Amino acid sequence: MQNYGLVFISLACALAAQSSFADAKQLRQYSASIEQSAWQLTAKTPLLCQLEHVIPNFGSAVFQSKASKALNLNFELKMLRLPDAYSLAEVLSLPPAWRPGEPGKSVASMSLLKQFNGELPKKTAWTLLTELEQGFSPTFYYADWYSPYDQVAARLNPVQFPPGYFAFTECVARLLPFSFEDIAFTVLSYESGSDQLTPESKRRLGQIAEYLQHDPQIESVELQGYTDSYGGRWMNEQLSVKRAEKIKQFLAEAGVAGEKVQVDGFGERRHVATNRRVVLQMARP
């Protein structure tokens, strides 16, 4: 009877220990300290603005906006250890210490895909920036893929946020209102019988020149000149080359290396209804 009692006590202790262990799932927290916290503008051009915050031993948080017709913003949570399976991270905004008793806010759920960083779309990204501006700490909670006993919390520290955020918003306000995709294929039209661009094409060419000044990744620019069917064929072909060469000269003055630009004149060949034009095509990696 005494042996049965000992077995019962041992079993009860084991079950209690197991229950206690399950309830005490560890939370690994990553956050920059007050001394470490920094918000840096790591890209500042008319094509790209990028605000970055390093989370020691975890990775970094990156807000990015690119030149485009529409206002855009993307958030990326870069992780040193990428997800090993699909899961969700709960995004909460936690109040600062000087606002005790205030509950955290549920901001969103972020999909975590295998071997990819986490990303959030424009609306949620702006919400995170607004929370940081008010002194809150957006925090990402998820189950650890590499340990069944742990959860992870990655926290953005709002200390030193205002100066970086102000520089970022200034940069975003100065982004070009068009992207590479908007100008990579452009048809420039001419006044009849001359090498003068129409007003709209002049404006478009100015945009292209401005873009080319800031994008060193442009590999090639192809210019194809065409005329209408009025006048002799030889004269039209020469006019089409002259038009394309004039565009090439304009691009050279904008800083585009001559070896990157290829010129072809087709005159009235490949004729279409409105054929007085130069077709400009750009390529990059």
For each feature predicted by the language model, list its residue ranges.
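Bacterial N-terminal signal peptides that target proteins for export
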Residues: M1-F8
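N-terminal signal peptide c-region/cleavage motif recognized by signal peptidases
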Residues: A17-S19
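An ectodomain-focused feature that recognizes extracytoplasmic/extracellular
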Residues: D23-Y86
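Extended low-complexity, serine/threonine- and proline-enriched intrinsically disordered segments
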Residues: N74-S106
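Short, solvent-exposed, Trp/other aromatic-anchored flexible loops in extracytoplasmic proteins
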Residues: K114-E133
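Second-shell loop/turn segments in exported
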Residues: Q115-E119, Y190-T198, R233-E237
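Periplasmic peptidoglycan-binding/tethering modules of Gram-negative envelope proteins
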Residues: S137-E219, P285
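Periplasmic OmpA-like peptidoglycan-binding domain that tethers envelope proteins to the cell wall
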Residues: T227-P285
